[in-house]
Regions:
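Bacterial N-terminal signal peptides
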Residues: 3-13
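Sec/Tat signal peptide C-region and signal peptidase I cleavage site
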Residues: 14-18
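N-terminal helical capping/dimerization or prosegment-like subdomains
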Residues: 19-116, 371, 477
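Sec-exported extracytoplasmic/periplasmic mature domains
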Residues: 46-54, 79-83, 155-159, 267, ...
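Active-site metal-coordination/substrate-binding segment of hydrolases
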Residues: 102-172, 176-178, 473, 478-484
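Acidic/histidine-rich catalytic neighborhood of metal-dependent amide-processing enzymes
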Residues: 143-222, 256, 263, 271, ...
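A short core secondary-structure module
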Residues: 216-217, 222, 242-250, 254-261, ...
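An extended, acidic, His-containing surface patch that forms the Zn2+-binding/catalytic region
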Residues: 290-291, 295-367, 371, 375-391, ...
Length: 501
């Protein structure tokens, strides 16, 4: 509670226009980095995205051949640049300098899956031609461009021979997208720096992160005999932290009247691209929305949710899939703040509202499983939020005289660190290089490895007010943004790590 009360004071500490400019040596270092390494960082990004560093179930990332090759590439580049390199399994650490105090720069080299059919070229090949000015690839924004940029920012610091009061350690996690346990295990053998900056989010400076939550609800029921149409399958989505772009539904027993009603509803909903395919009295409906990171569901169009609304109010034969559709229409809808889901909706004055994303639906022999991603601000404990989720689901089942579906939850606390000393210099760097004099600290819905480290905040790589493309099927970073990031990351390192008076 104390940290909640201190947040207004934190914001008041950084009024619009406040903060000095970066010192001269930081500005000079940034200029050197841009002059010498702006093109080189893009070349390194092209090398890094070629590695398909996607988690494969049943195989530890640190042991996977693609990850091993990726780590080897980082080691070779670090040694070429004159840095030391240590492999801790779940993380690798690339270091510059031998000062006792240390500055940690946190990033990650693993990426989310990508559907090749949705990319003009292979998602694991840097495409700088299809859309001039954009560097398109899986990992371009999240988080391989920041790795390439940080390495060249460190190289610029080394070139200039700046004396260091803090050793710089670039910490590259290998499991940020799938499992944080290997990072936690590495921290039993690696003592983290006391000052840390993650480069896995957005600007100006991220000082708070919403809690991450998953809710899985499984409906098990055999289709009962009857004359009503029977939903045979309801499926879509790729992974938990993505707004689903694709969804499909197969329904038997469709007559002309139902088909006409569905056609009319689809025509009224132009947010989604619809495809209807009939075979006898069987109808397959496909919906195409827009993928986005599930921490920013407002940037996406949820194909699963919109597909469910097409069948709202229709009498359907009881089945696992029909129960799932009713659940979605009753408790989720096409909103993103949980207003329909019992009492779960709430907001925090700094961190913003709870968001709810229906991420995936899977139809199996056991039934239909819905996976829902929640991003929860401060203001409710995980225990309270879980109770409200379960109460709402129980009320839904009771009202329909249905057995309670299988419910699995995993909820974490919001991240609200005390005010770290690096916030003011980072804001000054951002204000200097962007001209945004009113920039202040922000909160995000995403969850990053920053919360595993002491005194950690996020600084980029994405600009405020610009849709984030990580986790989407159209991930890119602009060429202009990479240059700007190189300036700001170099200035940041020179200011916080160099001993220049």
């Amino acid at each position: 509670m104390l940290r909640l009360l201190l947040l207004p004071l934190l914001l008041a500490t950084f009024p619009a226009g406040a903060g000095e400019h970066p010192p001269a040596h930081a500005i000079e270092a940034a200029a050197h980095a841009e002059r010498e390494y702006d093109a080189a960082q893009v070349e390194l990004l092209a090398e890094l995205v070629r590695f398909r560093t996607v988690h494969e179930p049943g195989v530890a990332n640190a042991e996977h051949p693609e990850f091993r090759a990726f780590v080897t590439q980082l080691r070779e580049r670090a040694e070429r640049f004159g840095f030391d390199f240590t492999d801790y399994g779940g993380i690798v650490v690339i270091g510059l300098g031998d000062a006792k105090d240390r500055l940690g720069i946190i990033t990650h080299g693993d990426v989310q899956p990508a559907d090749p059919a949705k990319w003009q070229r292979s998602p694991f090949e840097l495409d700088a031609e299809s859309e001039p000015g954009r560097l398109i690839a899986r990992g371009a924004e999240d988080d391989k461009a920041p790795i390439a940029t940080a390495l060249h920012a460190m190289k610029a610091i080394r070139d200039l021979g700046l004396p260091l009061k803090r050793r710089i350690e670039l910490i590259v996690a290998l499991t940020e997208e799938s499992d944080w346990a290997p990072f936690r295990e590495a921290l039993t053998r690696y003592t983290p720096p006391e000052m840390n900056i993650a480069i896995d989010s957005q600007y100006p400076v991220v000082v708070a992160e919403k809690g991450f939550g998953s809710l899985r609800v499984t409906f098990a029921a055999d289709a009962v005999p009857g004359d009503a149409p029977a939903v045979m399958s309801y499926a879509g989505g790729a992974f938990l932290s993505q707004v689903p772009e694709d969804a499909s539904l197969v329904i038997d027993g469709v007559d002309n009247a139902l088909l006409a009603r569905l056609d009319e509803r689809a025509a009224r909903n132009d947010k989604v691209a619809w495809d209807f395919e009939t075979s006898g009295d069987t109808l397959t409906v496909r919906a195409t929305g827009r993928a986005a990171h599930s921490s920013t569901p407002q940037n996406g169009i949820n194909a699963l949710a919109h597909l469910a609304t097409l069948f709202a109010g229709e009498p359907l034969r009881d089945s696992a899939a029909s129960r799932a559709l009713d659940f979605v229409n009753t408790l989720i809808g096409t909103g993103i703040h949980g207003e329909l889901f019992g009492d779960i909706a709430y907001a925090h004055p700094f961190m913003g509202p709870l968001t709810v994303n229906l991420s995936t639906a899977r139809t199996t022999d056991a039934g239909v499983e819905l996976a829902i991603n929640l991003r929860a601000p401060a203001g409710k404990t995980p225990v309270q939020l879980e109770r409200e989720l379960r109460d709402a689901i129980a009320a839904w089942a009771d009202a329909r005289k249905l057995p309670l579906p299988v419910i699995e939850t995993a909820l974490t606390e919001a991240y609200l660190p005390a005010q770290p000393e690096q916030v003011a210099p980072l804001l000054a760097v951002f204000r200097h290089y962007t001209g945004q004099r009113d920039a202040k600290p922000i909160s995000i819905g995403g969850g990053t490895n920053a919360r595993l480290m002491p005194n950690a905040v996020n600084f980029g790589p994405s600009m405020p007010g610009v849709p984030y493309t990580g986790h989407s099927e159209h991930e890119f970073i602009t060429r202009e943004q990479m240059t700007l990031n190189l300036r700001m990351y170099t200035a940041m390192l020179a200011w916080l790590a160099a001993d220049v008076r």
